Amino acid sequence: MLVLVSPAKTLDYDNPAATTEYTLPKLTQYSEQLIEECRKLTPADIASLMKVSDKIAGLNAARFESWSPRFTTGNAKQAVYAFRGDVYTGLDADSLSEDSLSRAQSQLRILSGLYGLLKPLDLMQPYRLEMGTRLANAKGTNLYQFWGDVITDEVNASLKEQGDELLVNLASNEYFKAVKPKLVNGTIITPVFKDRKNGQYKVISFFAKKARGMMVRYILDNKVSNLEELNKFDMAGYYYCEAESTAASPVFKREE
């Protein structure tokens, strides 16, 4: 079982990672090409393109400028510990056991606008480049065109490496669009999380993101390897709703 998640906008480079182990990202030759394009942008360009404040635009212009093709523990941090945000709150990587972290390294992949696909312990320099950014590049007008089949090929390689054909999509639509489902050598499962509010069950972004992270944690801690085990997910009050589920899209609900 291979699991895909989105990255996060919020980063933490102040606190040390929970492990000194690290690996190096595989697709940095592509990252370098994107950094070259990003360095052409002024802070005002970045503010407009990314719809961020002048302060955040300035910070990211500086990040693009200082980005180096050489990754060290001085300029980078393991991705799963660097990302902060709702998904990563749910995952709580800081408290993973050694066994669960080891499973994460083979079973969890993080989609990224700049790095393509990251293993949890891949060193990552700070950046902000969301997959939906319309950044003109040598291959087109956006990052989906830039990455083409590259990310899908890496997903297939990771699926093959970890030994089965089940791909659990816990990423957002924006990020999963970088994967080409028809080219995936496996079965794609996309869990849906619904919370009850005002008498109705609906997908509430904040809760759904956190639930995705909790499901990753559940998979790692419980050595989940098939759909039957996945559907037993019951963290934080969620329960499997068979009536609304399909094989490709299991639905999990939670009361108010």
Swiss-Prot record:
Highest taxon of the lineage: Bacteria
InterPro entries: YaaA (IPR005583)
Pfam families with a match to the protein in the record: H2O2_YaaD
One example of a Gene Ontology biological process annotation: response to hydroperoxide
This protein's GO CC annotations: cytosol
Family from the record: Belongs to the UPF0246 family.
Protein's recorded name: UPF0246 protein Swoo_1284
